[in-house]
């Protein structure tokens, strides 16, 4: 994996790529809010010698800093497209965990024919019809919660709340410690992320996935209403849904072998 950069009007995005043949399948891993490229370590280790792989530190996250908080979800999708073009990628399978899954859906809205596949890991649908007005109202007002909550408790609840295994919890804690001593930045990243998510929902666009897709969700995912959303998303769209037994919100860190197998089977069917 080689660390690379992509310049934007708001700052520089850092990403890691291993691309041997850009005309073959490329797995594009998008971590969730406040997580960074390390979220997918177990996937990168497994797949980097099988497929092309790309993973980023999302805008304003970890090494993609300094970065102005003057962008929306569609800017993120456009910058992702810039990275894929920069690498000459023609067959991308976008694999988004949580917020990364929302970026994937925004990408599908902007570039409906450019994705070869889409995998949502513990994410949820972006369509307005799935969320209540109260949920949108709350999303817009999360930053003060993260700014004023004691950091020690945030670290504990943030890591224990998203994973069921020691590996998953320790990894999330390590990623959160990137912002140790700068809780304001952590709160800004989280608050801004939730606001641009709410704004994308309020746009009330179709966000239709036109390529083969797969939903994955941990059976112990207690972040928001992920389990409920995935059931309805599956029911309404008929996109296959795979439950990751015993896994939390970061299910790819709790049950990497199970998640890797599902990704492998999915890609084999579309190759």
Model segments located where?
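Active-site loop/oxyanion-hole signature of alpha/beta-hydrolase fold enzymes
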Residues: 54-95, 261
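N-terminal cap/lid segment of alpha/beta-hydrolase-fold proteins
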Residues: 1-12
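Conserved alpha/beta-hydrolase catalytic His-Asp/Glu region
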Residues: 129-131, 148-208
């Amino acid at each position: 994996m080689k660390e690379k950069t992509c310049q934007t009007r708001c700052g520089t995005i850092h990403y890691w790529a291993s691309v041997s043949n850009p005309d073959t399948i490329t797995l594009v891993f998008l971590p969730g809010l406040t997580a960074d490229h390390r979220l997918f370590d177990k996937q990168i280790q497994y797949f980097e010698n099988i497929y092309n792989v790309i993973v980023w530190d999302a805008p304003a996250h970890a090494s993609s800093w300094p970065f102005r908080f003057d962008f929306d979800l569609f800017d993120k999708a456009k910058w992702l497209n810039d990275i894929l073009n920069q690498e000459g990628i023609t067959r991308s399978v976008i694999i988004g965990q949580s917020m990364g899954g929302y970026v994937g859906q925004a990408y599908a809205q902007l570039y409906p024919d450019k994705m070869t596949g889409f995998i949502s890991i513990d994410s949820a649908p972006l369509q307005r019809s799935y969320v209540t007005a109260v949920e949108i109202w709350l999303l817009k007002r999360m930053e003060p919660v993260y700014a004023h909550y004691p950091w020690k408790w945030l670290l504990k609840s943030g890591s224990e709340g998203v994973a069921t295994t020691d590996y998953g919890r320790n990894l999330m804690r390590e990623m959160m410690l990137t912002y140790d001593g700068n809780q304001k930045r952590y709160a800004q990243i989280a608050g801004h992320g939730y606001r641009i998510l709410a704004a994308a929902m309020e746009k009330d666009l179709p966000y239709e996935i036109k390529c083969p897709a797969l939903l994955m969700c941990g059976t112990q995912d207690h972040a928001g209403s992920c389990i409920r959303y995935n059931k309805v998303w599956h029911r309404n769209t008929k996109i296959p849904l795979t439950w990751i037994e015993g896994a939390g919100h970061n299910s790819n860190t709790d049950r990497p072998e199970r998640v890797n197998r599902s990704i492998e089977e999915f890609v084999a069917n579309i190759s």
